[in-house]
């Protein structure tokens, strides 16, 4: 783990030095007419379209274009790297700003991926005996953690890593008595079992998970946003949408912005 992280950091530093000499400027034309995802990548950004992936440097220079030929492509970003995968497919690629670092095929269809700041990657796949399997790869692509979510645990639909690259939150959904049930598991790659558990109100669907700092996880659900203690899973604060619908959410440090719509109006809610 430590060796893989050190090698990754050395490679990222070498990339940064080389890329600083690439000419570029803004506004930048990406060449992608049907963007699906746009994520910040080490000061630049990566843009995913239905057929192409474009990587740009901090100065607007176009660094590379990838054509993965996936039916349902998705990306997950971690500072200078990103995971490129085919949802419901089995191919996973770890990409840097300058090239492909790692390619593998999973035993079952990929449901979701997430990446920590140092390139640690969590991969959620289908499983024939469990709701899903979660496997965590370190920056050197060795498996360091596995978790099998039972049917009562639910299927992971949201993941979020802490800045220590070791802890993560997994938001899982299942059906209970005809309603959606959301459970949030607080995990540590050094522990065999989940560290803590939070169960949302019946009918509340987990959408996003963010670590605001080392001890607080923001869980964004379909009807509210809750702040959780990362050690105990206890709810420490809550904001209910009051019947409005969530359009978007953003975090900056410990601040949170929620964009809500309802009754023909839009509201921007700032939380601290």
Question: Residues of each region from the PLM?
Answer:
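Extracytoplasmic/luminal low-complexity segments enriched in Pro/Gly and acidic/polar residues
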Residues: 172-272
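Short beta-strand elements that form the blades of beta-propeller/WD-repeat-like
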Residues: 36-48, 54, 75-87, 92-93, ...
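Sequence/structural signature of beta-propeller modules
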Residues: 1-33
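Non-cytosolic head/periplasmic domains of membrane-anchored proteins
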Residues: 62-171, 178
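Conserved blade-register residue in beta-propeller folds
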Residues: 55, 84, 93-94, 135-136, ...
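Short loop/turn segments that connect beta-strands within beta-propeller blades
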Residues: 57-59, 96-99, 137-142, 189-192, ...
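A short beta-strand motif characteristic of beta-propeller blades
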Residues: 17-30, 60-67, 99-105, 143-149, ...
């Amino acid at each position: 783990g430590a060796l893989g992280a050190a090698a990754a950091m050395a490679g990222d530093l070498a990339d940064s030095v080389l890329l600083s000499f690439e000419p570029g400027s803004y506004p930048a034309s990406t060449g992608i007419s049907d963007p699906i995802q746009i994520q910040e990548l080490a000061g630049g950004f990566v843009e995913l379209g239905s057929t192409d992936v474009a990587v740009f440097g901090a100065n607007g220079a176009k660094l590379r274009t990838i054509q993965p030929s996936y039916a349902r492509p998705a990306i997950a970003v971690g500072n200078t790297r990103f995971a490129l995968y085919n949802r419901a497919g089995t191919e996973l690629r770890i990409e840097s700003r300058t090239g492909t670092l790692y390619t593998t095929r999973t035993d079952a269809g990929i449901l979701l991926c997430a990446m920590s700041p140092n390139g640690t990657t969590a991969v959620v796949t289908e499983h024939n005996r469990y709701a899903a399997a979660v496997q965590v790869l370190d920056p050197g692509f060795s498996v360091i953690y596995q978790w099998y979510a039972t049917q009562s645990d639910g299927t992971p639909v949201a993941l979020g890593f802490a800045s220590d690259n070791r802890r993560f939150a997994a938001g899982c959904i299942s059906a209970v008595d005809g309603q959606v049930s959301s459970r949030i598991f607080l995990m540590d790659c050094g522990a065999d079992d989940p560290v803590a558990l939070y169960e949302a109100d019946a009918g509340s669907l987990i959408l996003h998970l963010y670590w605001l700092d080392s001890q607080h996880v923001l869980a964004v659900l379909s009807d509210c946003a809750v702040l959780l203690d990362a050690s105990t899973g206890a709810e420490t604060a809550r904001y209910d949408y009051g019947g409005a619908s969530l359009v978007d959410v953003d975090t900056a440090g410990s601040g949170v912005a929620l964009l809500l719509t309802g009754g023909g109006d839009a509201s921007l809610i700032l939380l601290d």
